[in-house]
Amino acid sequence: MLNFLNICSKTRKSWVLLIFTVVILELIALYLQHIVLIKPCVLCVYQRCALCGIGIAGLIGTIAPFTPLRFFSIPIWIYSAWKGLLLAKEYTDIQLHPSPFFMCDLFVQFPHWLPLNKWWPSMFDADGDCAEYKWYFLSLEISQWMLIIFANYLIIAILVSLSQIIDLKKWNNK
């Protein structure tokens, strides 16, 4: 399996597939926000940013998948998936174990040099409540789905990373 993942990581199609999954998830988020009229909370917006990080990793991998440039994309992928997983876990905990004393941030906080909520407010501005149940699909809430999605992204990224290490060992033994 690791050999298969190593071979896939050297093809442009697999990196485009990674970007495609991110685009689909972002489009679903925008559909839920603008068509179904579910207001995103701060944690939702931060999870969108984590998805964008995975998309950027896919873009870097797509540029030159057969060169060592892909080694730069894998840590970005792992970091973004990990941060997304932590955010989704926090969001799920808020919804499964509500506290009357908890209140999520009212505004997203981006660095002053990257004010995404000002550049693209329809995507990165939050005005929803984290503790509010918003939407169910197959008996799971959005936060629970995102927990599953980010866990899968992280597992695949770690396996792809391991496949690169194994490939390097084969290269050094020749």
Swiss-Prot record:
Major place of residence: membrane
GO biological process: protein folding
Disulfide bonding pattern of the chain: C41-C44, C104-C130
Localization (cell): Cell inner membrane
GO-annotated cellular components: plasma membrane
Summary of the function given for this chain in its UniProt record: Required for disulfide bond formation in some periplasmic proteins. Acts by oxidizing the DsbA protein.
Protein name: Disulfide bond formation protein B
Organism: Blochmanniella pennsylvanica (strain BPEN)
